[in-house]
Amino acid sequence: MKITVLVGGVGGARFLLGVQNLLGLGSFADGPSKHELTAVVNIGDDAWMHGVRICPDLDTCMYTLGGGIDPDRGWGHRNETWNAKEELAAYGVQPDWFGLGDRDLATHLVRSQMLRAGYPLSQVTEALCKRWQPGARLLPASDERSETHVVITDPTDGERRAIHFQEWWVRYRAKVPTHSFAYVGADQATAGPGVVEAIGDADIVLLAPSNPVVSIGPILQIPGIRGALRSTSAPVIGYSPIIAGKPLRGMADECLKVIGVESTSQAVGEFFGARAGTGLLDGWLVHEGDHAQIEGVKVKAVPLLMTDPEATAAMVRAGLDLAGVSL
């Protein structure tokens, strides 16, 4: 069984744990497995900060699957310290709203050194994963720059300007007047090595219940990926990130509002659309009690709370069942 999953950060990483639980991979393995898991990971959040390249979603997936994630925050290193952040603040270095943990900083330093030496992000990620042994192949959506920027009304002067997604998300917590998202560099990027093949060779492709606008959306903006999803012989099954009109974490509702999409399972399913038409989905899972009816898409209501890897594995199995795919 080959499963390919499109993911963002915290929620996507937890979803991957459920896939591993079902397949007996990674920390859930009790011997060799015939199954393969590939994650196509969002790079829209990536940015240069304090001279190092940060890749939040790649790192969150790597740390989570490798057992090094901070379990309370859901991101960053377990047992993190913040000495470097305190020293940077003492120097008055900007941006002061973005903190790099000491352990996390080591990852960014290694990545930045390799990037400056000419290695592409996909090879850098593969090298970093040798330490963490995530039990899955983590593929950046692209090796090229493709960043999510946000057009806001600047609260300091009332002028419109574009800022990096990290500033909108971390500094402003999405609480400034917001007008649109821009995927800078996406139109000039190409799908990362192995990405199109992972979609085409899969037995099933899953869209994790990550933020549809700033996690899954930036992946779909990269030329070649949407086409691969539409042409693959594998069924494409999506999971609603909205439960009872609200996202469980993050600010998906704020993002959806910006692009004029309601925070409902119905609306998000329609946002992705049916592959039978011009969209991507063959199946769409919504939380029990929620409802959706999308022409050309099989819809099923099941529990979608990722309370633990076992509960998440049940979600994954429900997706396989909806697609008629057997382990």
Curated annotation (Swiss-Prot):
Its EC number is 2.7.8.28. Keywords: Magnesium, Transferase. Signal peptide: none annotated. One of its GO terms (molecular function) is magnesium ion binding. 7,8-didemethyl-8-hydroxy-5-deazariboflavin binds at D59. Its cofactor is Mg(2+). It is an enzyme of class 2 (transferase). It comes from the Bacteria. Pfam families: CofD. InterPro entries: CofD, CofD-like_dom_sf, FbiA/CofD. It catalyses: enolpyruvoyl-2-diphospho-5'-guanosine + 7,8-didemethyl-8-hydroxy-5-deazariboflavin = dehydro coenzyme F420-0 + GMP + H(+). Belongs to the CofD family. Homodimer. This is Phosphoenolpyruvate transferase. The lineage of its organism: Bacteria, Bacillati, Actinomycetota, Actinomycetes, Mycobacteriales.
